[in-house]
Amino acid sequence: MASIERTAYPQFKRNPVVRELVAAYTPTDAEVAFVAEYTRQPAHRLTLTILLKTFQRLGYFPMLDEVPPAVVRHIRSALKLRVQVKPANLANASRYRYYRRIRQFLQVRAYSDGGLKIAARAVYEAAAVMDNPADLINVAIEQLVRDRVELPAFSTLDRLTRRIRTP
């Protein structure tokens, strides 16, 4: 099993500095308009913006409880919401609707929409010249990003590289 730290798989930084927060998590006017179009309540505006900005940064949708508090505070402040506003607990239907709208807005395809074929082809071709699992995972990540496909869970990429490397 490859270690996630040895790959390019995106993760949150433990203690992001203000400059990083501003650069990666401040919503643009177009993003604020997008969020306002689909939400009314402050908690839902915060939630949709968190999902949007973290997806842009990571390439996949993290669980809301995995988002560092500093990121939540920064986005809440950027939206000019009160400190008491917390991310909404979304029902599955709402969460998946938000995911679909974010993908449409960013023009990114879901991994389930052909991502496995793209990643498998990239890993298969790269396996002819390299055999380090972390390198093969990086090849898959690079190809998925290039083709504007959402990244799957790290374990999915790890299993894929093990399956392709094993004759």
Predicted regions and their residues:
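Long amphipathic alpha-helical coiled-coil/heptad-repeat bundle
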Residues: 2-167
